[in-house]
Each structure stands twice: as C-alpha cells, then as structure tokens.
C-alpha cells in the first residue's frame, strides 16, 4: 500500500488526501529533533559522536515534563554497513545516522521536542499529544502522513504553520464562487530556525545523501524514513511551494515487513525509504509543480 499527502506550503491546503491513519515515521521524525536542536542555539556544524552500537542507561535523557520516565536501557544501532564516527549534524542528517540524533537528543529536553512537534501539527493518529519518550527521535510513535507533510510545510514557509484544509473553493448552484474557509495560520517557530532546518535538510538531496534520487531539476529538501524490519518506508520532502509525504507499507497487516515482498515486479531482500518512496515522491512532485518556477531553499533568505 502507499499513501501520498501534499500540503500547500503557504496556505495549508491539502492537495491529495487519502485518509488520516497513523504509522511509525521512522527517520522522518529526525527533522523535528533537528529543528529543536537549531531552535535551542546549536548549529548544524556542531559535531556528534555518531558511532554505534550505543546502549543508553535509564535517565540518560532529560524529560522535564515526566522526570520519572526512565527510558532505558535503550540500544541504538546505525544501518548495517554505515561507517559513522565523529561527524557534523549536517552530515548525520545527510546520511540519516541514528546514533548522531540520539546524541543530539542528550543535549535537548524530550518534552520540548514533543512540544515543538505539537506546534507544527504532529500528534498521534487519534489527535492526542505524543508521549515524551526518547524513542521518538528515531520515529518510535504513530503519526498520520498528513501531519508529517504539514510539519515539513512549516519548514518551507519560514516557520508558519497552517492547519490543513481540504476545501479549495465553493460554488453555489449557479456556479458563483462563495467564500471558502481559510487556513488557521500561526508562526510556530522563528523564521531563522525554520530556514536553517530547511537548509540542513537540503543535504539529503546531495550526492551521498539518502534522498539524492529525489532531485528533479530544482532545489528540494526532505528526509527519508525506514522503520525496523522495513515495516514502514517514507520520504517527506518539500519545495517552497509544496510539501509531500509518501508512505509505503502494509496497511492491512500490522507489523508485516516489506522485506521479501515483490513490489512492481521486484523482490526486495532489503528496502529503505530511498528505494520506492523517494522516486514516487519525485514523480508526483515533478508533475504537481510542472508549471511552477524553481525556487531556492530556503526561499526567505
């Protein structure tokens, strides 16, 4: 199964709604950790020790809103074959290095990460707030694809979050236009944080990045995601005009891996967000933006 959601980066309009179910977002949630990292005065040029495996003891992470939450021991691994050591946050983002982001989380408050997520529309599938568990850094919760598309639209729009609306226009019986509901927009994060988040997420589309195959003749930014055993694969990406989330997984059988499945005539012995979600995103976006100009990212400075 696959779901594709697109959100107008300026107005919050939904381009292609297909339901509002929840799936683990995997590494696409790293963009939220990155935004909180930058919001708190850190830089994408700072270095972290991204080597793995790591095993975090209870109470390693700050959870100010729930101090009794032990959250450990928690083993963290990088993708097999990844050669990661001390690297910049930008490089950890480009390569989607798990241990790099858990090390970043040690310098943050998990509750502030969930608060930031809520401010840009990321909640559980039932609308309730995310649990302040450190595992959210690697996407250990259930969220709707629409929420992820709209959150990334906030990065594209200089920090402005607009609640998604499905109605583009209203016509009466005579064909006369009537006032359509407008998106409820707020400045969820300062423009500098949003722009630097967008700028850092551009790294994934560069050679050696997990989303290098998403490029279609214009600047793009985004983040791939793959959950344990490849039960969910994602790409959430944006241009200044449009943010789109692509999820591929098995919506009918919870917990069923995509490994060993035949998709489009190809049987995958391993599969990541870069394999199917990225090219699907690219093909959709290239058509959706065929008549729109190529703009820089960020487009606000």
Where are these regions (language model features)?
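Short runs of predominantly hydrophobic/aromatic residues within well-ordered alpha helices
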Residues: 89, 101, 135, 145-148
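Short pre-catalytic segments that frame enzyme active sites
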Residues: 1-87, 95-96, 115-137, 141, ...
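A small/polar active-site loop signature that marks catalytic segments
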Residues: 98-119
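Generic alpha-helical secondary structure signal
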Residues: 87, 91, 108, 112-115, ...
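Active-site catalytic microenvironments for nucleophilic, acid-base chemistry
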Residues: 36-40, 107, 119, 154-158, ...
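A penicillin-recognizing enzyme superfamily signal
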Residues: 2-29, 47, 91, 142-301
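Thr-Gly-centered strand-to-loop micro-motif
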Residues: 77-79, 103-104, 138, 222-224
């Amino acid at each position: 199964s696959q779901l594709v959601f697109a959100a107008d980066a300026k107005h919050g309009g939904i381009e292609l709604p297909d339901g509002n179910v929840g799936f683990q977002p995997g590494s696409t949630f790293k963009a939220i950790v990155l935004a909180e990292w930058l919001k708190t005065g850190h830089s994408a040029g700072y270095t972290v020790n991204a080597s793995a495996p790591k095993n975090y003891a209870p109470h390693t992470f700050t959870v100010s809103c729930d101090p009794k939450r032990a959250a450990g021991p928690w083993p963290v691994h990088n993708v097999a074959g990844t050669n990661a050591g001390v690297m910049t946050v930008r490089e950890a983002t480009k390569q989607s290095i798990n241990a790099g982001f858990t090390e970043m989380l040690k310098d943050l408050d998990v509750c502030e990460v969930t608060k930031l997520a809520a401010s840009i529309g990321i909640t559980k599938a039932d609308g309730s707030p995310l649990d302040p568990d450190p595992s959210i850094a690697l996407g250990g919760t259930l969220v709707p694809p629409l929420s992820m598309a709209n959150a990334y639209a906030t990065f594209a729009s200089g920090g402005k979050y607009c609640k998604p609306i499905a109605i583009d226009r209203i016509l009466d019986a005579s064909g006369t236009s009537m006032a359509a509901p407008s998106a409820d927009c707020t400045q969820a994060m300062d423009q500098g944080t949003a722009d630097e988040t967008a700028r850092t997420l551009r790294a994934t589309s560069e050679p050696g990045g997990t989303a290098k195959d998403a490029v279609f003749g214009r600047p793009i930014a985004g983040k791939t995601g793959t959950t344990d055993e490849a039960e969910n694969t994602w790409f959430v990406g944006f241009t200044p005009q449009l943010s789109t989330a692509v999820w591929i997984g098995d919506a009918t059988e919870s917990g069923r891996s995509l490994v060993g499945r035949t998709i489009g005539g190809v049987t995958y012995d391993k599969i990541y967000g870069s394999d199917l979600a990225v090219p699907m995103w690219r093909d959709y976006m290239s058509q959706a933006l065929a008549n729109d100009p190529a703009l820089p990212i960020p487009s606000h400075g």
